[in-house]
Amino acid sequence: MHEMSLAEGVLQLVEDTARRESASRVKLVVLEIGRLSSVEPEAIKFCFEAVTHGSIAQGAALEIIAVPGAGWCMQCAETVPMTELYGACPTCGSHQVQPTGGTEMRVKEIEIE
């Protein structure tokens, strides 16, 4: 489960930000997770709750925004929606599709007090 190490990385970033801003606690963390990122939202929620126990982020709400997948089809020469990382182009069926979006995970927002 790689979500545990991802949650630990998010916590480190959140703690660093809270420390830099002299915050007393973290109220909310908003993550953007791409549909093609191989990150399971429910698993990251579970892991986030586990790793934040006893930290400045304990009890913080975790909001996840799903980012749709997109890719460049070399056959169609256009951007197409993608639901699978190595899926076929929904327009022409070609597998020559280069992902251009939805593969990332990033911290979009941190709300602190």
Curated annotation (Swiss-Prot):
Superkingdom as given in the UniProt entry: Bacteria
InterPro entries in the record: Hydgase_Ni_incorp_HypA/HybF_CS, HypA/HybF
Pfam family, one: HypA
Spans traversing the lipid bilayer: none
PROSITE patterns xref list: HYPA
GO MF annotation list: nickel cation binding; zinc ion binding
Keyword Zinc attributed: yes
Binding locations of Zn(2+): C73, C76, C89, C92
UniProt key word Phosphoprotein: no
Keywords assigned by UniProt, alphabetized: Metal-binding, Nickel, Zinc
Example GO BP: protein maturation
Binding site for Ni(2+): H2
Record-stated family: Belongs to the HypA/HybF family.
Role according to the record: Involved in the maturation of [NiFe] hydrogenases. Required for nickel insertion into the metal center of the hydrogenase.
Name of protein: Hydrogenase maturation factor HypA
Organism: Dechloromonas aromatica (strain RCB)
Gene name linked to the record: hypA
